Amino acid sequence: WAFIAVAMVQTKALRPKGFPELIGNNFFLIGYRVFVRYTNQAGRNLRGLYILKSETDKKKMEFFGNIFTHYNYATTDIHQSTKDGIIEISSVKSGFKLRVETEEDENVPLPPGSPFADWKEARRFAGPLPFTFTYNKETKEVLIIEGVRQDWTPNPIKLIDYNFDFLSTLKLENPVLANAFIIKNIPYYWKKGKIE
C-alpha cells in the first residue's frame, strides 16, 4: 500500500518560532501529503510526508507561508459548518467537500476496504511523522523540516462522505479510504529546515 494524507488544520496564533503569540494569526490549512521514507546524507532513514499540495483560506498565509516554506500554498475558499452532529468542510474553488460525525468513538468501524485490521494498527499511520520533505527539481535539492508536536492523540471519527477533486488528478488506481481521525489542541513548532 501507499498512503496519502489529507490534513485539515485549524491553526491558532500561528507565527515564527520565538515571536509573541500576540502577532500570531488564525488560518485554516489543507495539506495533501504522501507517506515516504528518505535516507539522508548521513545514512539515517527518515520517515515523513512529501508535500503534494497546500491550501489556505487567507492570502496572508499564502504570502508568508511561501516565504518561510516550500509548501507552495494557494488561497482558496473554505466553508465550515456544524449542524445536527455533523461537520461539513467544503470549497467551491478547490472542488472538495467532506462530512464527518462530530462524535469521537472508538467503536466507529473502519471504512469499508481499509487495509488496517483495527484502529490500533491504523493509528500507526496517523503520525505524528516527524519530517516533511519538498524537492526542488531545478537545484535537485531536498528540503527536510522536522516538526515537534505534543499531546498527539488521534481519535477515530466517522467520515460520512467525501470528495477531493485534487485526488482525482493523481490518477490513482482503486484508492480506498484507510482511516479518519481528529486530533485536537496540539502545541506544534518546526525546527529550522535542512537542505541536501
Spans of model-derived segments:
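Internal, well-folded beta-alpha domain core
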Residues: 31-196
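Glycine/small-residue-rich interface belts in oligomeric ring/scaffold proteins
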Residues: 1-32
